Amino acid sequence: MFTFISDLDHTLIYSHQKDGACVEFLNGCGLTYMTPAARAIFYELLKQDDFLFIPCTARSYSQASRIEFIKNLPYMICDLGGSVYVDGELDSVWMSILKDRKYCNPAAIEEEKNWIQLYFEIPYIKLHYNRDLFFLLVFKNTEEAWQAWNRLKRRTTPDIRYSLQGRKVYCVPTGLDKVNAVQYLIEQYHLKNIHTSGDSFFDKKFTEIGTTLLPAHASITHNTEYRTKATGMQAGEELIKKIEDRYRKTNSSILT
């Protein structure tokens, strides 16, 4: 089995791409895109019985499920590793582990959210509360987001941390990390031949597992990584072509 565990946004799919093939719609409007070549190759890979794709995303299950190729996948990691889905159902074993090992901290997140709503002076467009796992602030532009993060990062404690991602600032428990969910799935289901991709701080630890492939614009680095030459949506195509090449070399089935 060839296993590909990857972040979605800014790794495989990209927003505001007029020349791309749309793979996600909301209320009739296109949201995210891939190059036509990337879409065609990836959809063929997904048809193969010995190719396993596991999304590993900050998105909620409902947000991720809007994407065309997120259909009938056996495993999915959502909410920055706070949720593991097996055959579309929330994995209760993982939820117990999450609490027992204190990967989540609902009380600290709630307290910080309340402080933001009462005292934070930099205006934000919206505050999105992801269950009791984490919350994020969306700002008008990247400059305002940076200004907010520059202030909020001083509030980092042993319980929470703030991270800047474009126009968004995330407040996340220090124990919540995608890598924990990835390791759980690998151990629980004996996954082999692991390849990982991502672009941001949230992807750093889990992309140390297996063979690492990163887009050129990624903010993370690894000693043994493969990094694309292209950036943006073209980087997504290059990543998928590299995955196809690795799949062909390590599996007996041949794409036609």
Model-found features: residue ranges?
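Active-site neighborhood of HAD-like aspartate-dependent phosphohydrolases
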Residues: M1-F4, L8-P55
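Hydrophobic "anchor" residues on beta-strands that sit immediately upstream
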Residues: T3-I5, Y75, H195
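Short loop/turn segments at strand-loop or loop-helix junctions that form parts
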Residues: S6-K18, D79-G81, D87, A216-A218
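Conserved beta-strand/loop elements of the cytosolic catalytic core of P-type E1-E2 ATPases, chiefly
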Residues: G30-L31, V172-L176
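Active-site phosphate-binding/coordination module
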Residues: M34-L118
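Short, well-ordered alpha-helical microsegments
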Residues: Y61-S65, A145, K178-V179, D203-K205
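Acidic beta-strand-loop-alpha-helix segment within the catalytic core
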Residues: G81-V169, P173-T174, E187, S252
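Mg2+-dependent phosphoryl-transfer enzymes with acidic/Ser/Thr/Gly-rich catalytic loops
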Residues: V172, V179-T256
